[in-house]
Amino acid sequence: MAASQVLGEKINILSGETVKAGDRDPLGNDCPEQDRLPQRSWRQKCASYVLALRPWSFSASLTPVALGSALAYRSHGVLDPRLLVGCAVAVLAVHGAGNLVNTYYDFSKGIDHKKSDDRTLVDRILEPQDVVRFGVFLYTLGCVCAACLYYLSPLKLEHLALIYFGGLSGSFLYTGGIGFKYVALGDLIILITFGPLAVMFAYAIQVGSLAIFPLVYAIPLALSTEAILHSNNTRDMESDREAGIVTLAILIGPTFSYILYNTLLFLPYLVFSILATHCTISLALPLLTIPMAFSLERQFRSQAFNKLPQRTAKLNLLLGLFYVFGIILAPAGSLPKI
């Protein structure tokens, strides 16, 4: 996007002459109104697609899958690696597609700008049609994985479809269609989709039935995942307000956003402390990440929001992994089925 060039004019580098839009160059080709994107290698193109997926956020979908699978293993003694991999790919595909939908609609609504964290379309790293095609591919990949899971898993079709397409709908409607993000309901969608729903999906795929207790065990992880989104929305509070959209961070203001972030950050540790005291000491493993949480609290308090969502996602990943290890290491019968 060469802002210094005059729109409708182009320099002929062969002759040094100025060529008007619509004229032909010495080779007989039409001169487009805007410069074309420079040709890039396939490696650069692949790197651009990976960047558009925001892979740093994938802890929000991988840790719930790991937790649901660990609960299935600890409660029923079953863990099919094929189902684990298929479930992880399906959830990752839906998550990645949801990120692309968010990128597309934020750009089309004029929310993303040069100072935004996601400048995939603003900087023309990819074109809008590239993002749309990639999103369709990922949703299709997710559906193919769901179909494979149906043939491999003992879970009933109606239960699998209900959970999977519920998550798929949530990932799209976050910014597409209704656009829950723009009416302060995005936090609720993320809290449900990348918390209880993803954990239940991974658990049910393994054991072939639904249960209540995986939803309860998903709460600490869901709160940590919501902290990622809330830190992102707090950082973008001013630009979102200028764009005319409403998020939870805008509604409650900076002070209560700080209080909410701390609640989302530290409440899981209270839950882990209670579980470690009354159930098994292995569930104290996530407490090892408390120093990271205090570091994030200081960064939020000082309003140094740069890279805060990414650092919160890193905490979410480590906390989730320690939580999963704690579940796996728990003695048989020590975990209550609520």
Swiss-Prot record:
Signal peptide residues on this chain, from the entry's feature table: none
Pathway info: Quinol/quinone metabolism; menaquinone biosynthesis; Cofactor biosynthesis; ubiquinone biosynthesis
Transmembrane segment boundaries: 83-103, 134-154, 160-180, 188-208, 209-229, 245-267, 277-297, 315-335
Catalytic reaction(s) noted: menadiol + (2E,6E,10E)-geranylgeranyl diphosphate = menaquinol-4 + diphosphate; all-trans-decaprenyl diphosphate + 4-hydroxybenzoate = 4-hydroxy-3-(all-trans-decaprenyl)benzoate + diphosphate
Outcome following mutation: D112G: In SCCD; does not affect coenzyme Q10 synthesis
Assigned GO CC terms: cytoplasm; endoplasmic reticulum; endoplasmic reticulum membrane; Golgi membrane; membrane; mitochondrial membrane; nucleus
Keyword Disulfide bond: no
Pfam families given in the database record: UbiA (PF01040)
GO molecular function (one): prenyltransferase activity
PTM annotation (N-acetylalanine): residues: A2
Its EC number(s): 2.5.1.-, 2.5.1.39
Membrane topology: Multi-pass membrane protein
GO biological process: menaquinone biosynthetic process; phylloquinone metabolic process; ubiquinone biosynthetic process; vitamin K biosynthetic process; vitamin K metabolic process
Tissue and organ expression note: Ubiquitously expressed.
Subcellular localization: Endoplasmic reticulum membrane; Golgi apparatus membrane; Mitochondrion membrane; Cytoplasm
Enzyme class name: transferase
Main location: endoplasmic reticulum
Keywords: Acetylation, Corneal dystrophy, Cytoplasm, Disease variant, Endoplasmic reticulum, Golgi apparatus, Membrane, Menaquinone biosynthesis, Mitochondrion, Nucleus, Prenyltransferase, Transferase, Transmembrane, Transmembrane helix, Ubiquinone biosynthesis
InterPro entries, per database record: UbiA_prenyltransferase (IPR000537), UbiA_sf (IPR044878), UBIAD1 (IPR026046)
UniProt disease link: Corneal dystrophy, Schnyder type: A form of stromal corneal dystrophy characterized by corneal clouding, resulting from abnormal deposition of cholesterol and phospholipids, and decreased visual acuity. Typically, ring-shaped yellow-white opacities composed of innumerable fine needle-shaped crystals form in Bowman layer and the adjacent anterior stroma of the central cornea. The crystals usually remain in the anterior third of the cornea. The corneal epithelium and endothelium as well as Descemet membrane are spared.
Further details from the record: Strongly down-regulated in transitional cell carcinoma of the bladder and in prostate carcinoma (at protein level).
Function description: Prenyltransferase that mediates the formation of menaquinone-4 (MK-4) and coenzyme Q10. MK-4 is a vitamin K2 isoform present at high concentrations in the brain, kidney and pancreas, and is required for endothelial cell development. Mediates the conversion of phylloquinone (PK) into MK-4, probably by cleaving the side chain of phylloquinone (PK) to release 2-methyl-1,4-naphthoquinone (menadione; K3) and then prenylating it with geranylgeranyl pyrophosphate (GGPP) to form MK-4.
Assembly with partners or alone: Interacts with HMGCR and SOAT1.
Family per record: Belongs to the UbiA prenyltransferase family.
Protein name (Swiss-Prot/TrEMBL): UbiA prenyltransferase domain-containing protein 1
Origin organism lineage: Eukaryota, Metazoa, Chordata, Craniata, Vertebrata
